[in-house]
């Protein structure tokens, strides 16, 4: 089985394990002091958490593309049931695509989006949207 691997620095591996267990609905496949990894089946993902205090949350953002708006809505509901704060965006233009998405932040601040692409779009973002795939993203705004 092939899967994407993401290795993330986290400030507190215990706190991160609680969050990612809720986010993906699975427990860690391996747990060691300062280390954990998850073998997520859907979406196929190997997530590695490495405790590195002070370096957590340093990525721009991470994402999971799903097939439909219904899957975005289901994820939003599941995350709300787990008391994880979400920010939903429907019909936004980002990275030359019209998307529905929901955002969450892990305990170290790394932003995650669960999104579906509805259609191609002529630009990166509609005027008034948060910085998306622009120089503004480098200033800390999440980008798709």
Give the positions of each predicted feature.
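Core segments of cupin and vicinal oxygen chelate
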Residues: 2-46
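Residue-level structural signal for beta-strand termini and adjacent loop
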Residues: 51-52, 117
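Vicinal oxygen chelate
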Residues: 63-111, 119-122
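Short acidic/glycine-enriched loop/turn segments that link adjacent beta-strands
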Residues: 32-35, 56, 95-100
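A conserved beta-turn-beta hairpin within the catalytic core of GNAT-like acetyltransferases
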Residues: 55-58, 123
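N-terminal beta-strand motif that seeds the catalytic metal site of vicinal oxygen chelate
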Residues: 1-14, 44, 61-62, 124-144
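Conserved beta-strand in the GNAT
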Residues: 46-50, 113
